[in-house]
Amino acid sequence: MVETTLKIKNKSGLHLRPAAEFVKKANEFQANITLERGGKVVNGKSIIHVQALGVRQGMTINLRAVGVDAEDAVAALSELVNNKFGEE
Amino acid sequence: MVGVVIVSHSLKAAEGIKEIAQQMGRDVPVAAVGGTADGQIGTDPLAIKEAIEGVMGSDGVLLLVDLGSAVLNTQLAVEMLEDEGQDQVVLSNAPILEGAVVAVVESAMGHNLEQVKKAAEEAIHMEKLL
């Protein structure tokens, strides 16, 4: 398992569009990907789950990936989050 | 990419849902259709048929409807399509707004019609408050 903690820096948090960007990127990988916030764990490949997590600016989330390309998945998704999804 | 048609009793509602859903993937063909031929609240099978044809590509079209007669008139619209078109069009049981959002994300990822339909229908069980 590959795991990292990410701080959400973009203004609007994981609202619809960033959540969609996250899910699209997550689906490029074979690995099983989950997000956790405050003890709630959701499937990182499902838009329904990711947007329901209610992640706002300043919150931290745990990103976990299990599978052959887990390391690449965590790296790519971390980059997306840390680059604020191309937003402010 | 799978196309998406949003059928509501109100054109404004359909267009609003389209606006939200397209935030999730700009390239996905989405059509909004609603209201009767004389602009009242309701649905019009001919307008729905034209909306389907407008987004029809080789990957097919998922149809999302609001309530009651929208279902019946959408089924009628599908029957009005050419035979080969009918096989590529699927009516979804998904909630119209949540389903549209999911469908556009799934379509943008290149998933097929069956996968897009299945994911959109999972929105029925969506918990808004985790």
Model-derived features with residue positions:
Chain A
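Compact, glycine-rich, soluble single-domain proteins
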Residues: 7-48, 52-57, 87
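Intrinsic disorder
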Residues: 3, 7-9, 73
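C-terminal structural segments of small proteins and small subunits
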Residues: 52-88
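Intrinsic-disorder/low-complexity, polar/charged segments enriched in Ser/Thr/Lys/Arg/Asp/Glu/Gln
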Residues: 1-5, 60-62
